[in-house]
From Swiss-Prot:
This is NAD(P)H-quinone oxidoreductase subunit 1, chloroplastic. It comes from the Eukaryota. GO terms for cellular component: chloroplast thylakoid membrane. It is a multi-pass membrane protein. It catalyses: a plastoquinone + NADH + (n+1) H(+)(in) = a plastoquinol + NAD(+) + n H(+)(out); a plastoquinone + NADPH + (n+1) H(+)(in) = a plastoquinol + NADP(+) + n H(+)(out). NDH is composed of at least 16 different subunits, 5 of which are encoded in the nucleus. NDH shuttles electrons from NAD(P)H:plastoquinone, via FMN and iron-sulfur (Fe-S) centers, to quinones in the photosynthetic chain and possibly in a chloroplast respiratory chain. The immediate electron acceptor for the enzyme in this species is believed to be plastoquinone. Couples the redox reaction to proton translocation, and thus conserves the redox energy in a proton gradient. Its EC number is 7.1.1.-. GO terms for biological process: aerobic respiration; photosynthesis, light reaction.
């Protein structure tokens, strides 16, 4: 039997080409994930540094300044310190619930980054139910807090977990009703479609102007979901020591710390996507890609500009949340529940009815 060497070389070349395509396909999938993970990490470190600097300025004191230039590496130094601290476990607590609780809180928040359109064609998963996926997955985080509080075998921790669950239920409903109103205006539950629906009229096409009541309710509910002052009842120092975090130390305590800032970042991103036009530039009748005269599919420069615009709007909301934390006092538990059930819920429901009526009359 005679083997044609030319055919063998062709087969080898074809197999190498197929292998190269497979490797390239894997890298093409992993690259956006790695970029977003790196971006999230840097963003969390930046938020911590900004909060410390802003709070120091408001209180007329010197903020972090020793770790790195202007103290930018202080958050990284604190995280490294927590990694090497002893991981204590309560002797009479439920070890499994105590250990799983922080992981559930962090993972449930990280999953929601899948549906955030940072720029055109730069979203990990464009789902038809993107905003509802965020609401559904974010509802799992309080379960982790409740597990942590119960597994700690500590009355302060358990009360903190119960408060977290009650607070989440109270403010999840107004938040969902506001998202429904936005979905009715955009005729879609996809985050990408919601951003596209706001792109036609530039600055005046933002849902902020079409849904002012919904924007205020969404803003307050987002702060409550993030457990930020004045809504940090689950970890009130004067009443519950540290709430559900009382018995935690080391890396597990660090996970809760990271989860709070991850939740704040994802809430800020959704404020940008739902109400501030996402990555769209604020010039009427001119889209981002027409403005820079670049190709939508392959314009790396355009994608970078879109990410920058999204982050600029996001950090504007972050600045508001930081200012709110250091200016307003903490609410009582009854005040917090009354605000959610007696004020925000009726307002968000009325806003949804008005939006539905306007959409019906416009048909």
């Amino acid at each position: 039997m005679i083997i044609d060497t030319t055919e063998v070389q062709d087969i080898n070349s074809f197999s190498r080409l197929e292998s190269f395509k497979e490797v390239y396909g894997v890298l093409w999938v992993l690259a956006p994930i790695l970029i977003i993970v790196l971006g999230i990490t840097i963003s969390v470190l930046a938020i911590v540094w900004l909060e410390r600097e802003i709070s120091a300025g408001m209180q007329q004191r010197i903020g972090p300044e020793y770790a790195g230039p202007f103290g930018v590496l202080q958050a990284l130094a604190d995280g490294t310190k927590l990694l090497f601290k002893e991981n204590l476990i309560p002797s009479r607590g439920d070890i499994r619930l105590f250990s799983i609780g922080p992981s559930i809180s962090v993972i449930s928040i990280l999953i929601t980054y899948l549906v955030i359109p940072f720029s055109y064609n730069f979203v990990l998963s464009d789902l038809n139910i993107g905003v509802f996926l965020w609401i559904a997955i974010s509802s799992i985080a309080p379960i982790g807090l409740l597990m942590s509080g119960y597994g700690s075998n500590n009355k302060y921790s358990f009360l903190g977990g119960l408060r977290a669950a009650a607070q989440s239920i109270s403010y999840e409903i107004p938040l969902t009703l506001c998202v429904l109103s936005i979905s009715l205006l955009s005729n879609s539950l996809s985050t990408v479609d919601i951003v596209d629906a706001q792109s036609k009229y530039g600055f005046w096409g933002w849902n902020l102007w079409r849904q002012p009541m919904g924007f205020v309710v969404f803003l307050i509910s987002s702060l409550a979901e993030c457990e930020r002052l004045p809504f940090d009842l689950p970890e009130a120092e004067e009443e519950l020591v540290a709430g559900y975090q009382t018995e935690y130390s080391g890396i597990k305590f660090g996970l809760f710390y990271v989860a709070s800032y991850l939740n704040l970042l994802i809430s800020s991103l959704f404020v940008t996507v739902l109400y501030l036009g996402g990555s769209n530039i604020s010039i009427p009748y001119i889209s981002l890609f027409e403005f820079f005269e670049i190709n939508k599919e392959y314009g790396v420069f355009g994608t970078t500009i879109g990410i920058f615009i999204t982050l600029a709007k996001t950090y504007l909301f972050l600045f508001v949340s930081i200012i709110t934390r250091w200016t307003l006092p903490r609410l009582r538990m009854d005040q917090l529940l009354n605000l959610g059930w007696k004020f925000l819920l009726p307002i968000s429901l009325g806003n949804l009815l008005l939006t539905t009526s306007s959409q019906l009359f416009s048909l």
